[in-house]
Amino acid sequence: YRILSSVQENVFFNGYLSHYAEVVNRISAKVTKVEGNSARHEATFMVTESTSGRQNEIPVWGEEYPSVFMRDELGTYDIEKKYFMPVVRDVPIFPRRDVKVGESWTAEGHEAHDMRRSFDIQEPWIVPFSAHYTYTGTVKEEGRTLHVIEGRYNIYYDSPTVKDRASLTSDLPATTMGFSHQTLYWDNHKGALSRYNEEFRIVIETVFGNTFEFQGVAQAEVSDFVAPSVEKIP
């Protein structure tokens, strides 16, 4: 399957608008193995970013990220620390029961951010959260029935690695705050998301007292979904 996602965001530094950015992520993924209730996904994320409104403007930046992960029937990821993609993981997570329209539930998830360029952090920067979901009903799109889920989570995370701030010689994220409001369109026949829309705001406060703020919208759509013939291990 393939996913095309895009982000449009304003980026602020210490309260002042730094620049506007548009990030496009072209994802190609394949399910290569099924083990019990989990499936192995092998994916390539091709990310390009264009910016405007900054003095040292970089018209287009791009990078390719490989990723391999297991995801179970409820949506939980099992992924090695070396992989930077996907950014949002364990969304959505379903309960172990049938969900009725109007019903809500909560589940843990996390975001994984690439901080190599900003802070020289060589592993994904993991930010946990607790998400609240509500199943709001169904919609018809191109003859398909999609199940609509509203997902929301707030973030407030103090980094455990920067407690001894006086000994630090380089800036690092100290506190990450923000929110994400998502509308998820789930295709029950395929057992996967069909598309989603998101509004978000993320603020990172650093050890040296700087703030980076990202606010904007995102959207993604799955295409070329093919039911593969994969190796199945009981």
Regions found by a protein language model. Name each.
Residues Y1-E63, A112-P234:
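Acidic, serine/threonine-rich low-complexity disordered tracts
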Residues E63-S67, R71-G75:
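Disulfide-stabilized netrin-like
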Residues D72-I79, V162-S167:
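Short, positively charged
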